Curated annotation (Swiss-Prot):
UniProt protein name: Cobyric acid synthase
UniProt xrefs under InterPro entries: Class_I_gatase-like (IPR029062), CobQ/CobB/MinD/ParA_Nub-bd_dom (IPR002586), CobQ_GATase1 (IPR033949), CobQ_N (IPR047045), CobQ_synth (IPR004459), GATase_3 (IPR011698), P-loop_NTPase (IPR027417)
SUPFAM superfamilies: Class I glutamine amidotransferase-like (SSF52317), P-loop containing nucleoside triphosphate hydrolases (SSF52540)
Its biological purpose: Catalyzes amidations at positions B, D, E, and G on adenosylcobyrinic A,C-diamide. NH(2) groups are provided by glutamine, and one molecule of ATP is hydrogenolyzed for each amidation.
Gene name linked to the record: cobQ
Limits of the GATase cobBQ-type domain: 250-437
Pathway: Cofactor biosynthesis; adenosylcobalamin biosynthesis
Annotated Pfam families: CbiA (PF01656), GATase_3 (PF07685)
Amino acid sequence: MSARVLMVQGCTSDAGKSTLVAALCRWLHRQGIAVAPFKPQNMALNSAVTVDGGEIGRAQALQAQACGLDPQTDFNPVLLKPNSDTGAQVIVHGQPVATLDAVGYHAYKATAFKAVLASHERLVERFDVVLVEGAGSPAEINLRANDIANMGYAEAVDCAVILVADIDRGGVFAHLVGTLALLSASERARVAGVVINRFRGDLALLQPGLEWLERETGKPVLGVLPYLHGLQLDAEDAVPRNAPQKPQSQLRVVVPVLPRISNHTDIDALLAHPQVDVRLIGPGQTPPPCDLILLPGSKSTRHDLQWLRTHGWDAAIARHLRYGGKLLGICGGLQMLGTHLHDPDGIEGAAGSSPGLGWLPLQTTLQPHKQLHRVHGRLLLGDAGVSGYEIHCGISSGAALARPLLQLDDGRTDGAISDDGQVLGTYVHGVFDHPQALAALLAWAGLAQAAPLDLAALREASLERLADAVHTHLDTAALTRLISREAACST
């Protein structure tokens, strides 16, 4: 029997689509329902490696966790990873197929939609319920033609839609009414109800507005979700705007916010740790004194390496190391730490070579075949367990690799430790997520007595809080009817 399909679309980007789908996934999973997440098309630089050796958006990996599933490529069949202001790497069913500009991708959409529908068909045959996340807003007029991410998908598979809006930003009624007004009649009929997200305050004061909204639009308000503080969930793309300041912390970490930063979820455990103060430094900001500089991943490593030089980071890093500070590079950050970075085929932009920062004796050549691995092993610094994933096109070689940072269970080694022990590099994302590895790396950086922190447990607790919020604040009877197809969409 085919699954029931329900889609969540948003009035804006960051309205709460990913979070609401994750919440609904865990709510259904707790009831013993076989549920799967799905996002037809995603644009994000934070990605995850699947059990079948592919790449999907991190939001869908988190939603899979909410369903009690390992991440699979069918959960996000089309992933766009921007590598310039006008172009993106196109990943279909987990594998890169092309790098296209906006015009090129528009022409490719018909092919991409076939991949979307193929994944959809497989999922509806395997699961009882498929919860679908839209992208951006369904009311983007310039993107309506050949849409595969929002109403184009919903109409093709004939599913109901919930529309979510973020009240914390202000203008929630304008967002909802305006979005509905810009939909076609058939699209509007698919919207079965609306959810208001991130509400703070007295719900009684909002009630007159909710009643007006239902009269004005003819759509039921399915609930108002409160602003949930302290959730530990993977960000899909945006770097945290307000990293919590911890003036009494015992370890200071500085991270440059690279223009093409990717998989910045690597710092989530550091952001959550009570003894670690993370400072995210953007253009025009001077790096403050710290114990550790962390160079994150990048989707355009040579471009971001030049950005570091332009903004004086090469001198800042040299000064930091001269005074005894520590330096860690992850994935693209590791490549930057070497002596040279070669891109002969233009994998990440214009073909060419760039000198590295020169803190590790290794060089990297970018190659068309992307390395995608989920890994487990030991951190040789402190002999701690570690797990994570690799997503990179670079192949590194050189003397630095004779002193690896990780011994992997598949027999490979990874990364490097400098001769003086001040500089580390690794291709493995998520290296801080394992409690043992986190403690060992914090000790290396200068925090000898680190409080234990289990990021996976924090994520699980956050998913449970989301499911509790659905149970408490949404009309679960109406949601059950929608999922069971006992109620037609409102008109």
